[in-house]
Amino acid sequence: MSRRFNPLEDPPSASSSDEEGKEIARNSSSDDEDDVSSENPSPLKTTLDAVSDSESGSDEETDSDSELEKKKDQVVTNPVDVKRAKKVKTSEKSGAKRSLEVDEAAVSMDVKRAKKVSGEEEKKKSGGGGEETKKTYFQRLWTEDDEIVVLQGLIDDKKDTGVSNTNKVYELVKKSISFDVSKNQLMEKLRALKKKYENNLGKAKDGVEPTFVKPHDRKAFELSKLVWGGIRMALASGMKSNEKSKKSSKFESVKHELDSSLPNSKNNCEDEVMDEGEVSFTKSSLVRSIVGLGMDELTAQQGLSKLASKDMKRFYEQWKAMQAREFEFFLQKHGFLFEVLSKISEAFGSNA
């Protein structure tokens, strides 16, 4: 029994004709590729061929050779380098743009500063005159030498007459002053110098003269002492003036008190005498004295009005006698104090 052919178990062997067909097809495809490659050469190959052909040229074509060499270098360059070069160019452009913006900002700042400076100069030009006028107006007229001249003039005039005469002093010093001084200006300066001297005296402690930083102040102080007296004399004169004011005020208060206490004074309301010969103290100084002790006036008047007429007369006589003795006591007291103050003033004057 013959075996049946199974194509899966025993595949048929390829025939020679089939192999030849495959070989032919392979060859034809390779030929086609060669034709395509020959028809479309790559740019790199074309450039290299052109460069190689140009190298075999004559010496007259050296310029074209160098250009081709540059093209060759450009073509052969790595694409990564090209990208980097582009980035560098971009950064250079951005840097140039940034520097241009910085330059423009600097120029604008310079322009603003120039405008500001010009504006300040214009303000100075426009307002400078006023400031100079103010400085000139408040400029010191009296120099230090002028002050010494004035004090020396006072001393010289006082030596001749014993008393300073401002009219003579003005005629004496006006030609030596550094400016055209008027008499009013001289009088104001004299008052200012005296006030300054008194202020310096106030700085003295225990009779010790104050210290000065500037030699001019020391010299002016020494000359002022010759004009208005030394420290002790000034203190004595100040004490005299204070004593006079105190004495005058004290005498005024004593006078007022005595006038109010005397029965016949103008400030005192006379004691009323009743028709029956009785005395009334309702408006007398006795009522005011009682009020001074703390009792109100109405209570004092009512209390005195309730006294018997005999007591009223006795109190009236005693009150008048005490007022007379009080007046004598005040006179003795103030005479004594005046004598003491006079001796103190003489003691200060002799030690000056």
UniProtKB/Swiss-Prot annotation:
Entry annotated with the keyword Iron: no
Amino-acid biosynthesis in keyword set: no
Domain of life: Eukaryota
Pfam short name (any one): GeBP-like_C
PANTHER family: BNAANNG10740D PROTEIN-RELATED, DNA-BINDING STOREKEEPER PROTEIN TRANSCRIPTIONAL REGULATOR-LIKE PROTEIN
UniProt record, GO biological process: regulation of DNA-templated transcription
Protein name (Swiss-Prot/TrEMBL): Probable transcription factor At1g11510
Similarity comment: Belongs to the GeBP family.
Chain intervals with Basic and acidic residues compositional bias: 89-101, 117-132, 241-259
Region annotation (Disordered) ranges: 1-132, 239-269
Acidic residues bias spans: 56-66
UniProt keywords, alphabetically: Transcription, Transcription regulation
